[in-house]
């Protein structure tokens, strides 16, 4: 990356992503009581097994974990607008913001419904903590079921996400209680493994991946303080440097339709086999995760002779812009799954950026997982200043390079 590009990536959206995961910092003392690797543990490639393998549902604690006086457990019904609104308000005010309090993730109600209502989701895995005197939601954690493949071993897991505790209650150490309670409820369904990500380093990641950003609306990114200029990089030069060609390399790309589900399932599962860690998608999974929803998930396919040959997908996660008189929203697209069999991967991601621009996104973000890193320099992505760690719960295996990670968690 040349100096101009390095200087241009000033305020980094990764700061938001990292802080979203860092808000709850749990010391290692708690994690050393859990079936996860210790900091100094190293496993060779032949190790691929649970830490604890003799679990039985009848041995799982039947009663909920005790909360501090004045607080009560609740189940958040993701199908109800009021419950989604409570989750939205908690996350908006307490889950994500950058150090300068300029950007805050803005999870829409529709996004939360998409993220948490996957096929066969378990209602009571959407766990809330309410302050009894006001009935206000002050804590939340969620999980959804997922079929994972770890080094060719297929495992039913829970994907854990959205751990959030109100800022005023951080001293009450609610986060470990939330984690233990979600673990208990997952175990009651005879599921003993989980996958999760965090910006903070915990015992111990299976892999670590950095975020990279491709500027789209250059002028806006500079005006809101997301990116910056310098003496060598003027506004006009920056706009020219990051100009996006509006012509697609794959001419027949179109929005995914219901009739594409079978072909897309085949393309996805066949492609993902090459990675050490990946999900296995059922037809119902494909329908849920990839059917386009405006301002939530964008999926484009190229169909040739009745077969799905290429896939582009990205999801929308905007941020509120605070204290700016001209703009109040930063529209960010996040790379999801992208597969090509007819062109180069560079051409595919170039088309993804073009489609993000057509849908009025300001920036296109991607982790260095799967094949993504190979195109970042050529397509003028800027490197983020932090990393996202991938973790497995109750599973021991060798760590791997992020290019061998084949899953994107929201």
UniProtKB/Swiss-Prot annotation:
Localisation per UniProt entry: Cytoplasm
Keywords for the protein's UniProt record, in alphabetical order: Acyltransferase, Cytoplasm, Transferase
Annotated residues for binding of tetradecanoyl-CoA: 30-31, 162-165, 171, 173-175
Family annotation (InterPro entries): Acyl_CoA_acyltransferase, NMT, NMT_C, NMT_CS, NMT_N
Transmembrane segments: none
One GO MF term attached to the UniProt entry: glycylpeptide N-tetradecanoyltransferase activity
Keyword Transferase: yes
Record's signal peptide: none
One record GO biological process: protein localization to membrane
EC nos: 2.3.1.97
Catalytic reaction(s) noted: N-terminal glycyl-[protein] + tetradecanoyl-CoA = N-tetradecanoylglycyl-[protein] + CoA + H(+)
Top EC category: transferase
Superkingdom field: Eukaryota
GO CC, alphabetical: cytosol
Self-association state and partner proteins as the record states: Heterodimer composed of NMT and AK2; AK2 myristoylation stabilizes the complex.
Family to which the UniProt record says this protein belongs: Belongs to the NMT family.
Job description of the protein: Adds a myristoyl group to the N-terminal glycine residue of certain cellular proteins. Myristoylates adenylate kinase AK2. During the asexual blood stage, may myristoylate proteins such as ARO, CDPK1 and GAP45. Probably by mediating protein myristoylation, plays a role in the assembly of the inner membrane complex during the early stages of schizogony and in the formation of rhoptries in the late stages and thus merozoite egress.
Protein name: Glycylpeptide N-tetradecanoyltransferase
Gene source species: Plasmodium falciparum (isolate 3D7)
